[in-house]
């Protein structure tokens, strides 16, 4: 039986076994290869996507559990690499081999959608499930701070009454930028 879900804002219907992992559906059924296979056991984070805004390991997520939900992959984070995390990643030149990086970016985007100004320890905690064999962790941390600063710079003038935007407003702007749709 076909399973209906929304991927990167578009309704999709996939006729696959209900226990097929979401990662398989993305890569093999839909041809969206930006999300990577690393371990297949929820140990490396390479396969991270957002499901209803939550960073999730797609390698262990049965497609049946995603029915009716909203999935965002690296391909849908922004139409033109304009998401603050993508811009920061480019500016800091984070990737080395690049294999882990779509998962890293998706975890970072989910973190910033919830916490607009994370500390080093909050970044480390949120990103600890994303393994990088090339050891780009220092640059990842720097890029998350840079993305947070970019977002803050664009968000602060938003209110005319002098009040700072609420966390909800910041989240809304990040979601609208593609962070957690
Ligand atoms: S491939 Fe999913 S966590 Fe490693
Ligand atoms: S950049 Fe090579 S594994 Fe992370």
Label each region the model flagged.
Residues 1-181:
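Signature of N-terminal electron-transfer/Fe-S-associated modules in redox systems
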């Amino acid at each position: 039986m076909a399973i209906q879900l929304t991927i990167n804002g578009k309704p999709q219907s996939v006729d696959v076994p209900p226990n097929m992992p979401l990662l398989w559906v993305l890569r093999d059924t839909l041809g969206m290869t930006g999300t990577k296979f690393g371990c297949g056991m929820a140990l490396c984070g390479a396969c991270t996507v957002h499901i209803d805004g939550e960073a999730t390991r797609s390698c262990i997520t049965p497609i049946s559990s995603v029915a009716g939900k909203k999935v965002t992959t690296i391909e849908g984070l922004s139409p033109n690499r304009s998401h603050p995390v993508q811009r920061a990643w480019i500016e800091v030149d984070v990737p080395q081999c690049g294999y882990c990086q779509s998962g890293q970016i998706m975890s970072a985007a989910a973190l910033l959608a919830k916490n607009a100004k994370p500390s080093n320890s909050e970044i480390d905690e949120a990103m600890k499930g994303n393994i990088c064999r090339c050891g780009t962790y220092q640059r990842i941390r720097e890029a998350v701070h840079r993305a947070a600063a970019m977002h803050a710079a664009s968000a602060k003038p938003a209110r005319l009454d002098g009040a700072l935007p609420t966390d909800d407003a910041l989240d809304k702007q990040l979601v609208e930028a593609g962070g957690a749709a």
